[in-house]
């Protein structure tokens, strides 16, 4: 299940979300700065949204309302893509292939199965790749621009970490859907009142049993509107503070709001709740190593053979590991300490080094191991379980604050970009 913080970045990581068949020259739906949104763009995404909705059993509003939402989404995408072009943001084929492989994996498909499914749904694979590339560029631009505007202070981290440690519901996760009734920059009192009345009307409809997803698609100005407002799973502390406070006593099925923020009025639906315990005890390893780096005077094979010779001398008692490390190791940070790396969690090491280390028993010396640094001889001295409660809570608090502030700032940033762009809608 995707986490809502990923969804807020706007990447449509679902296998059947793509524009349809290759586009031809057609009418312009909107002019966006020095670019355009074509009618075929709108029609393609309309087809995709309807396909997704049909497969998910999601109700949709009338075509005119749906088209408006889709056009606004494409206008915003065009604005951000233009920014990415000016910034020189590129997505390599390797990055794109890895992203698509991850999408296939998330949907429990092989790549061949994904291609077949796209073809079955009438979606062109080449066009699908291009759209995923665009979405990755949009995500990178948004992440870079929004994160530059965010500051997380140490005292904020300490305060939230303390709160996490004392709250009984710190591990509670919620599955939410969201509707945003947007306000323009510097709204008038009349605009605020109109938006509030509309939000209150939507809340009443939702509480009377109206389909929340359809309401989101119809009215919401949020980037997830076309997905029925679905935000997915996340912890309450990861939400903006005004949301977290309103949801502190919420139950499954509750409609919460309207909640006023700087960008408009928010309505939330609690689709589900769950508890998730978090282990904060970690295993640390105490290891030492001898590193030989291949060079013009010592190739890979010679380095490996030299380490085998050193290992044999250690095991026969001709020398000790510490003495050999001081004599031969080319790691300046540990050689003088007899190769001692101190206590650390295995995940800080090079993957090849880490994998070899975690397979060793206490007191065991590895065979020569090749990593990105060279060739290693590794000895596992000891392991221990360490209570990392305080550090884990602070790390968790920092990530929650980043996610919370990103969510708040991203909405403001997108509103600013939309307001400052030249946009002319040419069709209805």
From Swiss-Prot:
Keywords from the named record: Chaperone, Isomerase, Periplasm, Repeat, Rotamase, Signal
Signal peptide: 1-20
Subcellular location: Periplasm
Record-level GO BP terms: chaperone-mediated protein folding; Gram-negative-bacterium-type cell outer membrane assembly; protein stabilization
Domain PpiC: 171-272, 282-382
SUPFAM superfamilies from the UniProt entry: FKBP-like, Triger factor/SurA peptide-binding domain-like
Catalytic activity reported: [protein]-peptidylproline (omega=180) = [protein]-peptidylproline (omega=0)
InterPro entries in alphabetical order: OMP_Chaperone_SurA, PPIase_dom_sf, PPIase_PpiC, PPIase_PpiC_CS, PPIase_SurA, SurA_N, Trigger_fact/SurA_dom_sf
Description of its domains: The PPIase activity resides only in the second parvulin domain. The N-terminal region and the C-terminal tail are necessary and sufficient for the chaperone activity of SurA. The PPIase activity is dispensable for SurA to function as a chaperone. The N-terminal region and the C-terminal tail are also required for porin recognition.
Function: Chaperone involved in the correct folding and assembly of outer membrane proteins. Recognizes specific patterns of aromatic residues and the orientation of their side chains, which are found more frequently in integral outer membrane proteins. May act in both early periplasmic and late outer membrane-associated steps of protein maturation.
HAMAP family recorded: Chaperone_SurA
Protein name per the record: Chaperone SurA
Native species: Salmonella typhimurium (strain LT2 / SGSC1412 / ATCC 700720)
